[in-house]
Structures are given as structure tokens and as C-alpha cells.
């Protein structure tokens, strides 16, 4: 008798690639996952995580700017769902990197008003202690700046993985008056890196990068400024990308669209399309 295969359900998630100007180009903020976490242990990733029920609640919607464009390039996603993905992106970036994409009561970026940074730091601690995000935002008279997020990618975990995510990736620029820092709960380090440097460190075996993170860094690598990167993100198509899974000999591999084992997806191109898992780390290998 053939046993039915159960595919784990998808959990909606948001990820933010936070960038800032650097000499001759840009840097991106990455966090190192703790060794004991259930997903992507020890890997360097962008801040992000699963959507919470409160991300789609009406009270948080009333505290958002930029609602008119949240569905842009999100396909069949409904308005409320699209807003929730954006709210989750802002919340997760705040929790994991200490960066709040919001306007203060004067309509300026949070951080530009006296007392803002102290409120941001205390609010982050309160959020970690269980204070509802909407309650915190409303009390400080902040407005979440959903329009500062630009969608650029949509990644879906392969069917075979035990924990699967339907993740939208957003690009954002670090507000000038704020400084990113890792949270210390799910992550053990936070670092700004040039995309090319992160790729080089991964090739050298110094850090671990999951295939979607690697691919994003390769996409950001050519840009000479944050303006160029944001212009690209605003204009790029956002196809649904679900990597393939298999084995090459006894080695576990993941393939991306365009690999010999996986059909191309219009609007998606990657410099590397095949990754092997060796010693707990993914590394790009030649496609067969």
C-alpha cells in the first residue's frame, strides 16, 4: 500500500533587506541566527519572521501610512493580507534589528524628534516583554511607514521541508537617525556587510547563507548606491519562486528556476541555480 505524503502547510512570513550607503555602493544588515533555533540555525539572514494575528487587525491598520500601494505586485493577495505582510515586515525589523520604519507625531521619520530614539529603544524592550505592537505605536502617536518598504521577491519553501514559509522580501533604507542592532533572543550577532563581502565570506566558509539570502545578495551586488537598488526593487517583477529539492549522489541539493532540473520562471534570473548542503552549510555548485 502506498502511503500518502503530507505536505506541511505554508506559514506566511515577511523579510526585510535593510540597506544603507557605503563608500562606492551599499551595505546590507544581516543577523546571525542562534545555534539552537529551529529554522536556519547559525545562518546569516535578513531580519524577518512569521506574520502574527495582530498584524492583520483593524487597530493596526488605522496606524499605517502607504496603504494604497500595498497590493502592488503581490498577485492575488487580498488587501488585508497585503497590509499584514507589510505590517509584519515593519514589526519584525523593529524586533530583530531595532529599526522602526515610522513617522513621528510631526510627520517626520522617527528619530528626528527629541526623545524619539529613547522611545524606540524602550518600545522595543516593551514589545519583547509582550506589549501589543498596535498599543505601543498608538501610545507614541507613530504612523507605520508601509510606503518605505519596497517588495522585490517572493520565496516559497520546498514541499519536502518540515517547516515551510510563504515569504515576501522587502527592501528598505535605514533611517538616518536610527542604528541597527540585533535583538539577542533569536540572533547572536548583527552586522553590516557589502553584498560582495558576504558572498566572499560564504565562499570561504566563514559564514552560512541560505540560497534565498545568497541570491538576494547577488542581486544587490552590482548597485553603486541605495538609490539604484531601490529603483531596481520598484521596477522588478516579483514571481513566486519555489526551489526544487533532490540529491546529487548522496549530497542534498536545492535548485532554483533556470537550473537544468527546474523550469525557468519568467522574470527570475539567478547567477547560481544549484546549491549543495555540506557540513550544515549551503554552497553553490555547478548545474549538471
Briefly describe each language-model feature range.
Residues 1-288:
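N-terminal leader/linker segments that precede catalytic domains of diphosphate-processing enzymes
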Amino acid at each position: 500500500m502506498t502511503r500518502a505524503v503530507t505536505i506541511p502547510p505554508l506559514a506566511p512570513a515577511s523579510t526585510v533587506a535593510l540597506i544603507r550607503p557605503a563608500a562606492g555602493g551599499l551595505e546590507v544588515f544581516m543577523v546571525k541566527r542562534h545555534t539552537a533555533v529551529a529554522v536556519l540555525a547559525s545562518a546569516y539572514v535578513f531580519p524577518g519572521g512569521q506574520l502574527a494575528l495582530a498584524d492583520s487587525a483593524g487597530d493596526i491598520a488605522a496606524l499605517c501610512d502607504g496603504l494604497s500601494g500595498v497590493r502592488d505586485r503581490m498577485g492575488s493577495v487580498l488587501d488585508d493580507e497585503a497590509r499584514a505582510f507589510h505590517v509584519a515586515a515593519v514589526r519584525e525589523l523593529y524586533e530583530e534589528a531595532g529599526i522602526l520604519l515610522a513617522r513621528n507625531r510631526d510627520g517626520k521619520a522617527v528619530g528626528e524628534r527629541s526623545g524619539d530614539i529613547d522611545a524606540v529603544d524602550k518600545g522595543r524592550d516593551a514589545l519583547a516583554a509582550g506589549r501589543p505592537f498596535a498599543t505601543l505605536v498608538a501610545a507614541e502617536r507613530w504612523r507605520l511607514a508601509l510606503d518605505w518598504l519596497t517588495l522585490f521577491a517572493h520565496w516559497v519553501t520546498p514541499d519536502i521541508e518540515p517547516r515551510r514559509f510563504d515569504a515576501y522580501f522587502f527592501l528598505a533604507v535605514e533611517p538616518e537617525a536610527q542604528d541597527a542592532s540585533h535583538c539577542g533572543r533569536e540572533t547572536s550577532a548583527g552586522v553590516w556587510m557589502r553584498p560582495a563581502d558576504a558572498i566572499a565570506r560564504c565562499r570561504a566558509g566563514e559564514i552560512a547563507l541560505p540560497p534565498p539570502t545568497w541570491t538576494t545578495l547577488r542581486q544587490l551586488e552590482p548597485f553603486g548606491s541605495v538609490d539604484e537598488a531601490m529603483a531596481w526593487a520598484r521596477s522588478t517583477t516579483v514571481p513566486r519562486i519555489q526551489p526544487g529539492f533532490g540529491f546529487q549522489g548522496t549530497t542534498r541539493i536545492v535548485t532554483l528556476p533556470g537550473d537544468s532540473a527546474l523550469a525557468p520562471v519568467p522574470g527570475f534570473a539567478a547567477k547560481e541555480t544549484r546549491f549543495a548542503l555540506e557540513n550544515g552549510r549551503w554552497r553553490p555548485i555547478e548545474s549538471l
